[in-house]
Amino acid sequence: MNKKIQNILTEIESVIVGKNENVEKILMAILAQGHVLMEDVPGVGKTTTALTFAKVLGLDTRRVQFTSDTVPSDVIGYSVYDKSADSFVYKPGAIMTNLLLADEINRTSSKTQSALLEAMEEHRVTVDGQTYDLPTPFVVLATQNPTGSAGTTLLPSSQLDRFLIRLSMGYPDHKSQINILRDHHSENPLDRVQPVVTKDELLELVQETRNVEANDRIFDYVTTLAEATRTHPMVELGVSPRGALALCRMAKAHAFLSGRDFVVPEDIAAVFPDVCAHRLILSAKARMMEEKAENILAEILKSVDMPVLKA
């Protein structure tokens, strides 16, 4: 594993206890220039995770706590008239940062959700006819409460598709919970976190991730998996071409963290559930049976032959 990557993980895991796998997946998503949706109950460390990543990676960060009265201009900014200059001046919103923590994104209106998610896809915002590019890198770590919680608005599938991966933090195990209590007993662990890389060094790691090689056998495997989701009897809407591209990007990051400059089929299989579960729309029968997308994807992985790469 790259030494810088190892140092990043070590520093983050000193705060985010017992969640090493999720920490690695979030770092992969950042290296793949993707956005992360963390879905879980309150109090399991979603916000702390986002703040820790921002600090360790040397990124500017801002936070939006979404509520029912959050409006699009809070996120993307607005124009105000400057009398002295006799012109309108752009006042940036929270989105003009490197890492945006979008807290409880499903508690706000569809209009505000759309403003954020369009900017996530296009990496720019348009206000009063003027277009403004977002900073580089730009990553959104969004949190949402489980569907059905009071005051939540379901994200449409087209908007869920903008997130590279969806994760659930889950409750810590017994030992990790004790460590969390011990760490927070006398101080906030975030106070002792130090930046491990600069913004420019992070961008170099992003470029190295992009340079990871993948061949036609890998592309064929990804395509076959995506097609299998579209024809599965329990799936109404499967993985889109954008989802297949996301799978390749995340697999490159998985290979990079594994110390390789090329993708193997195991990279695809490892990230398949996290990249694709939130992109599936299950059939009425599947929903009635309370079937889970993750179980369907596991079944598809078993049914599709993994290619053997030639040396």
Region spans (language model):
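Pre-Walker A (pre-P-loop) alpha-helix and adjacent loop at the N terminus of AAA/AAA+ ATPase modules
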Residues: 2-44
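Conserved alpha-helical scaffold flanking the Walker A/P-loop in AAA+ ATPase domains
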Residues: 24-28, 81-101, 130
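Walker A/P-loop
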Residues: 30-67
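Walker B catalytic acidic pair
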Residues: 40, 103-104, 115
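P-loop (Walker A) phosphate-binding loop of NTP-binding proteins
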Residues: 41, 75, 143
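AAA+/P-loop NTPase substrate/partner-engagement loops
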Residues: 56-84
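Canonical AAA+ ATPase core
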Residues: 82-85, 108, 112, 120-212, ...
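C-terminal engagement/docking regions of AAA+ P-loop ATPases
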Residues: 231-311
